């Protein structure tokens, strides 16, 4: 099995893309925050808080193999946008079998009403572990050649991960294709 050299992902045009592999990613992120607040009554404090949260998310993601960060404005008041962080997770101690990985993740989920639902799904790109929470959806897609997992981390802090947003995120994940 050939290890892919890249991937293709269909993300709607309304989502703002930040390439975390380039040095100028901070300026692109700043551009998004500025555009999101343009023509709206957004306080300087909220704008600064959104910038700080997104920057911290991008920096933490880069430290864990994130390559792309997509953002979608979901409110008129300039609050936190919906986002998609695309990361490469080398196998390391992570089980290469999606069923075993799902079981491993399930064991780490705390009991209670906030417990995320873990399942294994089959995408066009291959088997994937799907982890659904109230405001997040993580899809870990096993790469051909067992090179690792490509992780799609969706977050929708304002409107939640249900209904149309969940279906949109599933459709984006379902569009994943490998480039060999």
Question: At which residue positions do the language-model features occur?
Answer:
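N-terminal targeting sequences that direct proteins away from the cytosol to non-cytosolic compartments
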Residues: 1-180
């Amino acid at each position: 099995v050939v290890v892919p050299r890249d991937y293709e992902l269909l993300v709607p045009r309304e989502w703002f893309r930040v390439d975390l592999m380039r040095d100028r990613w901070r300026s692109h992120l700043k551009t998004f925050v500025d555009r999101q607040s343009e023509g709206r009554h957004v306080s300087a404090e909220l704008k600064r808080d959104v910038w700080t949260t997104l920057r911290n998310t991008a920096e933490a993601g880069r430290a864990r193999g994130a390559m792309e960060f997509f953002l979608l404005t979901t409110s008129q008041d300039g609050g936190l946008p919906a986002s998609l962080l695309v990361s490469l997770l080398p196998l390391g101690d992570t089980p290469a079998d999606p069923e075993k990985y799902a079981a491993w993740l399930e064991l780490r989920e705390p009991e209670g009403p906030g417990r995320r639902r873990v399942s294994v799904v089959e995408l066009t790109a291959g088997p994937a572990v799907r982890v659904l929470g109230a405001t997040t959806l993580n899809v870990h897609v096993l790469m051909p050649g067992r090179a690792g997992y490509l992780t799609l981390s969706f977050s929708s802090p304002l409107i939640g991960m249900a209904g149309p947003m969940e279906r949109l995120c599933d459709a984006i994940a379902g569009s994943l294709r490998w480039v060999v």
